[in-house]
UniProtKB/Swiss-Prot annotation:
Belongs to the glycosyl hydrolase 28 family. Disulfide bonds join C42-C68, C221-C238, C344-C350, C374-C383. The active site is at D219, H294. It is an enzyme of class 3 (hydrolase). Pfam families: Glyco_hydro_28 (PF00295). The gene is rhgB. InterPro entries: Glyco_hydro_28, Pectin_lyas_fold, Pectin_lyase_fold/virulence. This is Probable rhamnogalacturonase B. It comes from Aspergillus oryzae (strain ATCC 42149 / RIB 40) (Yellow koji mold). One of its GO terms (molecular function) is rhamnogalacturonan alpha-L-rhamnopyranosyl-(1->4)-alpha-D-galactopyranosyluronide lyase activity.
């Protein structure tokens, strides 16, 4: 779907409590998948693919892409496919990749199983919300091998979306967004092994909206890396994960205007972890709002001397203009690992940090106390020092023995009771319909055509979307008008090329507005793992 920004005047007049968006402009593909499919549909079955879990999908997928790369839709129908040679799909324009089947890794090369690069106006999706990649990473991990392939990588892709898709058990990372622009990623489930180095979503890009995603692993949940600008991360369910973070940050770090909102973290290493060791550059204008956590080792953690990362030299990465707002819940052991730990570089103290409405408490009934610790950090709240003379200082720690008011927070019914280990096949999950307590996903799953999705208050008025009947053949796609629609989606049949912004996913059409946010003026024992 295409998301369009509104003017600041419109935002302020319609929703006074919201300020300028973290995003800098429109995100998503320029044309719908049905339009692409009507131009041309390239079904991999017509290029030699077989849904027999044995025949290599790689060559048929590459051939189908070659025929549709200049405008069209590449279609992988339902069924089980083997991928033994990786697919590098480069130079596409106005194209879509619809994967309704399950792709199983059968090859052993490194690199990326599906690598999409130098493309524009692109969409990857499953019309059934059940298309998946199964990496079978346990076949590596049970032998303590961690250098296998990644599942999905986008590089230098503009005006794109990835949605209604499932990634399971990567031998290495699951999903990377590398130097991409104007993208939207949503309605996904990512499930990996319980070990470091099996990242969920890594993003170093510009103007990208990531929302409504569940991640299970033991490393990065959704993590921003450098360089990145104008990234909005919302409605994220870190369900037995490593947790969200930024980094590792090193030399010439360039990160700004990042918002994390509505982040639910269960039984993970941390709720938000900003990690570095030396380095240079800066990360500024960061908002971490509406976080709920339970059973996590760390809550908010800035570690500028992270021991799992080799020193990068330099005075350190300068962190500034950071706001934490509305954090609730519990941590595993507040006496050992307090909910606020901020360690900034001696050579580049952090400043303009604001911590407000932060209430968390320990789950350790035998030691009813917790601490807050700050070093070289300036701002307002808890252990932060005030003042404009930002000089280095030794850590100051405050210990409290009574629970703060208002710390109690909701849990999620789907909170996992155990991890998936690293020695057995991990089952393919279904994409959930809830990612944060009380928050409705922005877009209904494509499999739930008649369901309702939440509409932000900021939406351009328009007539309802007109939906034409879909046919059952891949080449004859349905059409729809590209106007914003009311909250209730219109039901329709599923067919190749039917995509968000039409009838299957987002009910808003191409006039949907950007959500807004204030512009800030290892294992069960929680072992940390170093990589990147």
């Amino acid at each position: 779907m295409r998301i369009n920004t509104l003017s600041l005047f419109s935002l302020v007049s319609l929703v006074p409590t919201l300020a300028l968006a973290s995003l800098s402009g429109s995100v998503g593909p320029l044309t719908s998948a049905s339009t692409k499919a009507a131009t041309k549909t390239c079904n991999v079955l017509d290029y030699g693919a077989k849904a027999d879990k044995t025949t290599d999908l790689g060559p048929p997928l590459a051939s189908a892409f070659a025929d549709c790369k200049s405008g069209g839709l590449v279609y992988v129908p339902s069924g089980d496919y083997a991928l033994s040679t990786w697919a590098k799909l480069s130079g596409g324009k106005a194209w879509a990749l619809q994967i309704d089947g399950t792709i199983y890794r059968t090859g052993t090369d490194g690199g990326n199983m599906i690598f999409i690069e130098h493309s524009s106006d692109f969409e990857l999706f499953s019309s059934t919300s059940s298309g998946a990649m199964q990496g079978l990473g346990y076949e590596y991990h049970k032998d303590n091998k961690w250098s296998g392939p990644r599942l999905l990588r986008l590089y230098d892709v503009t005006d794109f979306s990835v949605h209604d898709f499932i990634l399971v058990d990567a031998p290495a990372f699951h999903f990377s967004l590398d130097t991409c622009t104007n993208g939207e990623v949503y309605n996904m489930a990512i499930r990996g092994g319980n070990h470091g180095g099996l990242d969920g979503v890594d993003v170093w890009s510009t103007n990208v909206w990531i929302h409504d995603i569940e991640v299970t692993n033991k490393d990065e949940c959704v993590t921003v890396k450098s360089p990145s600008k104008n990234i909005l991360v919302e409605n994220i369910y870190c369900n037995w994960s490593g947790g969200c973070g930024m980094g590792s940050l090193g030399k010439d770090t360039d990160i700004s205007d990042i918002t994390y909102r509505n982040i639910y973290t269960w039984n993970s290493n941390n709720m938000m972890f900003i990690k570095s060791n030396g380095g240079s550059g800066s990360a500024t204008n960061l908002l971490f709002e509406n976080f709920i956590g339970h059973g996590n080792a760390y809550s908010f953690d800035i570690d500028s001397y992270w021991a799992s990362m080799s020193s990068q030299g330099g005075n350190g990465v300068e962190l500034s203009n950071i706001t934490l707002r509305n954090w609730k819940g519990t941590e595993e052991n507040g006496a050992s690992r307090g909910p606020i730990k901020i360690v900034c570089p001696d050579g580049a103290p952090c400043y303009d940090i604001t911590i407000e409405d932060f209430a968390m408490w320990t789950e350790d009934s035998s030691r009813q106390r917790q601490w807050y610790s700050c070093r070289n950090a300036y701002g307002t709240g808890f252990c932060l020092k005030s003042g404009s003379n930002h000089v280095a200082y030794e850590a100051t720690t405050t210990t409290v023995s009574s629970a703060p008011s208002g710390y109690s927070a909701a849990t999620m019914a789907a909170d996992l009771k155990t991890d998936f280990g690293i020695t057995a096949s991990i089952p393919i999950p279904t994409i959930p319909t809830s990612f944060y307590p009380g928050a409705t996903p922005y877009s209904a799953l494509m499999a739930n055509k008649g369901s309702t999705a939440k509409v932000r208050a900021v939406v351009a008025p328009s007539k309802p979307t007109t939906v034409a009947a879909a046919t059952s053949t891949p080449a004859e796609q349905q059409t729809s008008t590209s106007t914003p629609a009311p909250a209730v989606e219109q039901p329709s049949q599923q067919s190749p090329g039917q995509s968000a912004g039409e009838v299957g996913g987002c009910p808003f059409g191409n006039g949907r507005s950007v959500p807004t946010g204030p512009p800030r003026a290892g294992h069960r024992h929680h072992q940390r793992h170093g990589h990147h």
